[in-house]
Structure formats: C-alpha cells, structure tokens
Amino acid sequence: MSGRNNNKLPSNLPQLQNLIKRDPPAYVEEFLQQYNHYKSNMEIFKLQPNKPSKELAELVMFMAQIGQCYPEHLSNFPQELKDLLSYNHTVLDPDLRMTFCKALILLRNKNLINPSSLLELFFELLRCHDKLLRKTLYTHIVTDIKNINAKHKNNKVNVVLQNFMYTMLRDSNATAAKMSLDVMIELYRRNIWNDAKTVNVITTACFSKITKILVAALTFFLGKDEEEKQDSDSESEDDGPTARDLLVQYATGKKGSKNKKKLEKAMKVLKKQKKKKKPEVFNFSAIHLIHDPQDFAEKLLKQLESCKERFEVKMMLMNLISRLVGIHELFLFNFYPFVQRFLQPHQREVTKILLFAAQASHHLVPPEIIQSLLVTVANNFVTDKNSGEVMTVGINAIKEITARCPLAMTEELLQDLAQYKTHKDKNVMMSARTLIHLFRTLNPQMLQKKFRGKPTEASIEARIQEYGELDAKDYIPGAEVLELEKGENTEDDEDGWESASLSEEEEEDGEWVDVHHSSDEEQQAIATKLDSMPMEERKAKAAAISTSRVLTQDDFQKIRMAQMKKEMDAAPGKAQKRKYLEIDSDEESRGELLSLRDIERLHKKPKSDKETRLATAMAGRTDRKEFVRKKTKINPFSSSTNKEKKKQKNFMMMRYSQNVRSKSARSFRDKQLALRDALLKKRKRMK
C-alpha cells in the first residue's frame, strides 16, 4: 500500500516535480491542481501570518522549483512572495520566512526576478533578529552581485544598489547597517566594487556612533585583513587546475625526464597565470581613492579629540589619521601636539604612537612643527636615566621622522645624538650609528667631521632642499653611464677584430691566445672614467642621452645600478676594499608606510627572565618520551606482590627485622656479590 500511495502525484510533490521538469506540457493539469491548492493555502495564511504552515512551505518550494516550466502561470508568484515578506517579515515564523527567502533565491538563480528589487528587499530583511537568515542573505547578496558583474561591470545595477546601501548605513537598526557595511567591504576586497564611490560610502561609516560599525570601517582602511589574505596561494574562485592537480597527475603517471620537464613547464605557466589573475595591489589602495582626504582627516581628528571610546579605538583613529597625512601629504598641524601628549616611556602602546608620529611626518610640514616633536622624543626617551631599550626606541623614532622630514633636525640635536655612538649599550650604539649613516646620505655637513666618513661622490652630491624647494632636473641623473658603456662596447668590438685576426695567424703555430675581457674590468674602466670626468660634463652627457633617445627598461636598470654603486662605494670598512661589488638588482623598494619593526628594532636580543626560560624548557619537553621502563602487570586488577609491599613498608616496622640488622653487618665479599647480582639483573632488564 505504501508503494501505491507514493505514486499518487497530488500527494507526492517531489515525484511530480521530477516529472514536470522532464515533460512540462504533459502535467499541466496536475500543476494547476497544485497551484490552486497553493493559492487557497496562501489566502488562509494571510489571515494569520504569525502561524507556521508546513503545507504552504512545501507548496512554495514546489512552485519555485518548477517556475521556469510554466512562466505564464507563475508570473505573479515572485511578487506575491516579495510583498508577503516586506509587509510581514517581523511576525512570520522563522522557518517559514527562511523558506520564502530560499524560494526567492532559487527564482533569482533561474533569472526569473529582477536583481535590484530583490536585493533591496533582502537588505531590509537584514533587520530581522534571525542570525541564520542574515548569514544566508549576506552570502546570496555577495554572490549575486559578483555574478552580475562577472562578464562586465553592470553600472546600472551597481549605482542603484550603492545608493540604497548609502541609506542603509544611516539606518537606525545597527545590525542592518553593520551587515550592509560588511557587504560593501567584501565586494571591495573581491575587486567587484573597487571604485571610488564604494570607498567614499565606507568613509561615512567612520563617523558612526555605533562602535561595531566604526571599528569595521577603520579596520578596512587600515588594511589588516588585506595583509592576512595577501599571501594565500589558492582562492575558491580560481578556475582551472591547481598545483596539487598537476603534482597528482605526475605522481600517478609514468615517471621520466620528459614528464618531469612537462610538469615544470606546466607549473611555470600556472604561476604566470596566477600572477595575471591577481589584481594589481599597492599599499592600502582604498586610502588613495578618497575624494577629499584633507576634509576627511580634519573630521577624524575632531572626532578623536572628543572620542569616548576604548583606548584601542582611539589608537585606530590615530593610525588612520597618520596614514592619511603621510600618504596624501596633508596639512594637519593640530595632530602633532595631540600626539605629543602621549609621548612618554610609561605610556601604553607608546611604540605605536611613535610610529604614528613618524607616519604623519612629510617634507611639506613646516620644520618648526616637527622640531618640537623631535625635542619631546629626545627629552623623554633619549636620556641616561632610561633603560637601553627605551633609548633605542627613541633614537629609532627620531631617525624615521627625520628621514621623512630632514629639515626638522637641528645641528645641535644631531651632534648630541651622534655621541651615543660610543654608548655602553649595544642597542643604543647601533641605533645612533644608523642615524649617523642616514645623515651621511642626506646632509653630511650637519655631522661632526669625525662622523662624516670618507667623502665620496654620493656624499658630495647630497644636499637637503630648503622648505618648499623643488629640485626639477632636465635630465635623468646617472644617464651618462650609458654613453660611457657605449664607448666601451665599440672599443671591445675593435679589440675583438684584432684578436680574431691574431688568432687566425697564430692558429698555424698551435699556440693559445689569452683574451682578457671581464665584466669587472669593464666596470672598473667605466668607474675610472666617471671619476675623472667633471660634474658639468656629466650633466651635459646625461642631458644629451635623455633627450636624444628613448630609454629601455635595461637602460633604466643600468642607471639604477650605477646610482646604487655610488652609495656602495661610500660604505666604510671591508666594503671599501672591494670596490666593484655585484649589486643585488632585486632590492626591495621601501613601502609608503612604516612598520612597527622600524621603531622597535633591537640589534641585541634582550635576556629572558627565569619564567620565560622555564616556560621554553617545559615546552620543549612536551614531545619527549619517558626513558623509564614501566612495569606492566598481566592482570592490572591483581594485588601487589610481597616484594612491592616490602618496599613500601614503613621503616619503623622493619628496623628490627633480621634482613635489616644483618645488612649493616655484611662483609665486603657479601656486598660485592650483592652488587654483582644487582648489575646482572639490571642488564637483563635493559635488554
């Protein structure tokens, strides 16, 4: 009977659904029967929308599954569900509300609903106190917008949704506003909505009175999540074979040099494709897309001065302001005195505050404003009453500030800090040396003569520009090296012809001809010519090359290497003996933001205290096996033997026994035999 009942189509919706999908015209009557049943159930439900209805939920999902089969009959079905959700979403049963949303998502996936109206409805449903529903809607919104912009940017839909989200961010419901912000941030990170409008909508969230929204917006601009995801090798969205697929294919196939070469080639191609697919990212690109960074930074500073949030939130605000000022080179003079109040060694997170002060420094800030900041750091940190670590942090901070704003450093302060080169603490000494080395490249004339080092071409050319001065050159510095290299190549060609003719003559005699043309000798010849050439002639040659030809990437690389060579020649000590070093061309360029390591850098590792050393030692023993052999009983529930009882017996009960009294009176021979037996027994046990 049960099998027969299962074949009854009106009561078995999954079977009917399967048959309709196979042949829709053949089952129109059965569909209309269910559709009328659905309409009657819907009318009853509208009278009491707060009551659950399992039958209605099944019918709604059935209609959604076959929506594409009868579009003329179900043309009003999506709108009915949307109206029901928009008017009654607060009173609906959670399970039924989830079913209606899933039905709409199913219809949207079949492209039977307009995306704009549906997404607006889903944003309104984010106000519901249903965590599972909010998570489902969030996933669908992100995926749907990604699919809309998959082939090309659909600006028409994007503009409508962005405007709607802008209103949602100002919504009184904190949950809905936070979810809307999360959607925008996720879409920006996936490079779907990576335009300036999205970024400037997110900037409004930085002034929200709701802490969660404020922190989410600040975290986005500070780029913490980008840094975490930057090094991930695989993404769920990437199509095509992965490195694992290629390795499995090689492991299961025939081994051989030919297949190995194929694998290596495939891995190279895969790596190249991944690089192409990877979006071009520069440091914290969202900050670069802000329309009016000056006004934004001023508003943030005003908010920071009256902020009553936790200390961590204040630190995030300070960090964002300092990044804005440093990257956009803004004028925010009130920020420096505000930061100056916190520059005390006992201040919580003082190294981060020093980092913010360094980030906010740039060459357009008047030097007198940064000078007061430098003096505060020097007076509070770089004094003998402080520990070596505090002094090191202070000198490192001064070095980073002056690297960005060299005019702020006075000659008197620099000479005082240079005296710490001979300090007893190694960290302080090395930090002072790095500061001296910085000014050897920036302006050696500010240092005392003994600290300037050997004068070289790079140090002679070094000069700090005056405040507001522009150093506009009509040539590419260092381009004269290309002219000299060209001359060397022509000479080499002539020598080559001569050596070739000589070798032809001497081949008959059977003698070898030694030809000496190494890259080191060429470098040496070019460097010698450069040294002998006056400065005016160099500039003229560089200007002639810059205006007469189009430079290639190789030419720029040669110029860069030559400029780096000048700085390498200025290095003291052992590097001076080896003049013609091979310079690493892959040197990493310095980013536009500082890291905390630049401030906290200690050249000598501090000693660990007893607790730290003990914790490290105990952590190393976790995986160590015990070397004592445990005695195992055949029956673990059996009682202890007489021998074990004897060992555990109280001595006061044993002191008058014959064994104890005779043990002390044993002869040397008895002791010798007892020792032998014990050793033999121990050896057996070790086996």
From Swiss-Prot:
The modification Phosphothreonine is found at residue 552. This is Protein SDA1 homolog. Residues 254-315 form a coiled coil. It comes from the Eukaryota. Belongs to the SDA1 family. SUPFAM superfamilies: ARM repeat (SSF48371). Residues 490-509 have a biased composition (Acidic residues). GO terms for biological process: cellular response to leukemia inhibitory factor; protein transport; ribosomal large subunit biogenesis; ribosomal large subunit export from nucleus. The modification Phosphoserine is found at residues 232, 234, 236, 585, 589, 595. Required for 60S pre-ribosomal subunits export to the cytoplasm. One of its GO terms (cellular component) is nucleolus.
